[in-house]
UniProtKB/Swiss-Prot annotation:
Gene: rplV
Record's GO cellular component terms: cytosolic large ribosomal subunit
Biological process annotations from GO: translation
Function comment: This protein binds specifically to 23S rRNA; its binding is stimulated by other ribosomal proteins, e.g. L4, L17, and L20. It is important during the early stages of 50S assembly. It makes multiple contacts with different domains of the 23S rRNA in the assembled 50S subunit and ribosome. The globular domain of the protein is located near the polypeptide exit tunnel on the outside of the subunit, while an extended beta-hairpin is found that lines the wall of the exit tunnel in the center of the 70S ribosome.
Classification of source organism: Bacteria, Bacillati, Actinomycetota, Actinomycetes, Micromonosporales
Family named by the database record: Belongs to the universal ribosomal protein uL22 family.
Quaternary data: Part of the 50S ribosomal subunit.
Region (Disordered): 124-152
Keywords: Ribonucleoprotein, Ribosomal protein, RNA-binding, rRNA-binding
Pfam families in UniProt: Ribosomal_L22 (PF00237)
Protein name: Large ribosomal subunit protein uL22
Source organism of the structure: Salinispora arenicola (strain CNS-205)
Length: 152
């Protein structure tokens, strides 16, 4: 299935929560934390985020991971949060009585939270990474003692 500009489309899944009773600006703060992270790491970040919106975003992300696992047969450990955005939903208008018979409008904002996860192939270790992983030369205790004795 060709995508935009005939670029290869990575397998993935998405989940949408609509009419969530949180201000879109507050939800965007939380969504910006997890965009581009591996899915399991993003769940951990959301679990410990102090914002109230993190609970709703956590549920949407968990749903997207479950969709990828059950519908697309993807490995949940190889998923990446490729897209995450918050759109504005309808605003409920309420009125609060004020002094001298006036009415004050209160806007109860809602939002739509969308999270898209994609499967990524595990990156093969490069030559530079394998050199860093090689253990350093170990020196014997006798060699280090002779070096320290000569320095004194």
């Amino acid at each position: 299935m060709p995508g935009k500009g005939d670029a290869p489309v990575l397998p993935g899944a998405r989940a949408v929560a609509r009419y969530v009773r949180i201000s879109p600006m507050k939800a965007r703060r939380v969504v910006n934390l997890v965009r581009g992270l591996p899915a399991k790491e993003a769940l951990t970040v959301l679990q410990f985020a102090p914002q109230a919106a993190s609970e709703q975003v956590y549920k949407v992300l968990a749903s997207a991971i479950a969709n990828a696992e059950n519908n697309e047969r993807l490995d949940p450990d190889a998923l990446l949060v490729s897209e995450a955005y918050v759109d504005e939903g309808p605003t409920m208008k309420r009125f609060q009585p004020r002094a001298q018979g006036r009415a004050y409008r209160i806007r109860k904002r809602t939002c739509h939270i969308t999270v898209v996860v994609e499967a990524v192939a595990p990156a093969a270790p490069t030559k530079a990474a394998s050199k860093k992983a090689a253990p350093a030369k170990q020196t014997t205790p006798a060699a280090t003692e002779s070096k320290t004795e000569g320095a004194e």
